[in-house]
Amino acid sequence: MSLISRHHDLRDADKAAVTALATRAQQADRTPPLNEAAQLALAGRGSAHVVHWLDTSSDPAIGLIGYAQLDPRDGSVQLVVDPDHRRQGIGRALAEQIIATDHPTSWWAFGNLPGAQALASALGLTVIRGLLIM
């Protein structure tokens, strides 16, 4: 079980937990889960308008298991789930809460990973563009 919460500002401890989560995901996936704009907003050097979503385990020893960032200016969301807690419905629960509350218009998925594809399919999302790294 976990607790999903919505924030306009994050405490330093939450920022550190998100950064650690993103690092674990990047190591597992070999691609960063958040783009530069999201990283800057997380660090307080980007958009002050973003909404942070935290999914925290009910077990304090585990801590943060999911994070999403919504930019309300364009309605886009970036979402990441801790690699050790994937395939448990965490991403879907987080995404569904964001959809119900903030009505995003687009989602970013980096690396075209199977988990992101499965989540997008489950939510009825379709690919509208792709990025090629050359």
Model-derived regions: residue spans:
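Conserved beta-hairpin
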Residues: A41-G66
